[in-house]
Amino acid sequence: MARVTVQAAVEKVGNRFKLILVAVHRARLLQSGRENSLVPEENDKVTVIALREIEQGLITESILKENNQHEDQIQKKVQMKTISSTQDFD
């Protein structure tokens, strides 16, 4: 069973509430398969993997914000292409 020192992860992020938000976001990315784990999985659940990545300093709030911005840009491009392709049919 994996042991995660939550206190070390809290120190990396700043406070426990921010840790929860960052860990949940990262766990969802891992669960959806959009990103791969940065640490050995060792049959751990995605929440444990996310906490271990944060504890080791591999994932930070700023990295996730950059990822969100990139995903938003991709989504906007897809929406624009969809809009332009539907306008071609009109």
Curated annotation (Swiss-Prot):
Entry keyword Transferase: yes
Keywords, comma-separated and alphabetical: DNA-directed RNA polymerase, Nucleotidyltransferase, Transcription, Transferase
Signal peptide residue numbers: none
GO BP of this protein: DNA-templated transcription
Enzyme class, spelled out: transferase
The protein's Enzyme Commission number: 2.7.7.6
GO CC entries: DNA-directed RNA polymerase complex
Catalysed reactions listed for this entry: RNA(n) + a ribonucleoside 5'-triphosphate = RNA(n+1) + diphosphate
Record-linked InterPro entries: DNA-dir_RNA_pol_omega (IPR003716), Pol_omega/Rpo6/RPB6 (IPR006110), RPB6/omega-like_sf (IPR036161)
Pfam families in the record: RNA_pol_Rpb6 (PF01192)
Biological function: Promotes RNA polymerase assembly. Latches the N- and C-terminal regions of the beta' subunit thereby facilitating its interaction with the beta and alpha subunits.
PANTHER family with a match to the protein in the record: DNA-DIRECTED RNA POLYMERASE SUBUNIT OMEGA (PTHR34476:SF1)
Family: Belongs to the RNA polymerase subunit omega family.
HAMAP family to which the protein is assigned, alphabetical: RNApol_bact_RpoZ
NCBIfam families membership: rpoZ
Protein name as it appears in the record: DNA-directed RNA polymerase subunit omega
Organism of provenance: Hamiltonella defensa subsp. Acyrthosiphon pisum (strain 5AT)
